Amino acid sequence: VPILVNSYFQSTSQVLSVQVTLFCAGFGTLFFHLCTKFKVPAFLGSSFAFLGGFSSVAALDTGIFANMADKEKLQYACGGIVVAGLLYLILALIIRCVGVKRVMRFLPPVVTGPIIICIGLSLAPSAVSNASTNWLIAIVALAVIIIFNIWGKGMFKIIPILLGVVISYVFALVLQGLGFTNPDGSVILNFSGVSSAAVVGLPPFILPKFNLTAILIMAPIAIATMMEHIGDISAISATVGQNFIEDPGLHRTLIGDGIATSISAMIGGPANTTYGENTGVLELSRVHDPKVVRLAACYAIVLSFIPKVAEIIASMPASIIGGVSFILYGMISAIGVRNVVENHVDFTKSRNLIIAGVILVSGLGFSDGLTFTIGSTSITLTSLAIAAIAGIVLNAILPGNDLSLIHISEPTR
């Protein structure tokens, strides 16, 4: 996310810091686990859903934003994210007051399943775009993951993603050492920032600033991310075989995610999310112990105080990220399909076909979102927000809704 966000700004230096992002991911994950009684094996990472918001804030050039430095624009974007995180608390309060069953009446598998599918498929262009920077390296990363996941033994079978990243990174180093470049002529690995970075140093934290325009750009994205959160928790539940929507409760997961997001933005980090990719990792590794996730969070915090590590991460070729994403994003969508199948959604019923169809088309069709104007301010809803709203509304108004709570069954091994 920092690599993508920084590409929206004109500055040649990091605007959104990798160090701060690592710290916020680690701290946010630990806080989330505290809120959820240490039961949910979720790692909070940077939300892709807010990329459009960052891009819009970066493009602002009127009023107070005219001739504004990139760092200051980031501060206003963070201010909007602080407000977005607080919206989670409102939904959590509603769930706490009326009960998760009444809320989940409006989010049966026919709604959450297609939303999970959209989460994965909506990220597919990002995977292809990143992989296309160097298809050879991307294919190596993809192949290594597949080989170790299918034919690996012992520990190697548990960590195919890490092996895919490390081996493809070494492969990229070898290619660069032999004089190869990316197809567009650019260097495969850029180590200019690594050599100048200190070994130990504090993350460059910054404080948010608040402006209504930036808030109205960033905060509505929470509509999508809250639905993504529910879909992610449903997917994690399906993967692990435990109903985390009931225990520790959806209100707790929302509180943990929302406050972690606001805290992250308060120190200059991106929005946190329960991370759909996390579900793919759980499925591939088959390691579901929350203690392992908390250990990973501690590693992230430690690494955030080592600038050289942050620069090495920043130097990772987009092609490696793309190759890994082919597996992870596909896993997310596949889990959405499994969620529908295991909950026996009856697609002989027209209402279910209509709901699922509208969600899928909305989630994939509105690639640029939907923009509307209130006064002089334009607000854009992302495709996932539109899909979620459409699915919830259709499920509520179409006849034949059994208003049943989502059922999480034991995952297929």
Predicted feature descriptions by range:
Residues 1-138, 285, 308, 315, ...:
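Early transmembrane hairpin of solute transport permeases
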Residues 24-33, 55-56, 84-93, 113-126, ...:
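Hydrophobic core segments of alpha-helical transmembrane domains in multi-pass membrane transport
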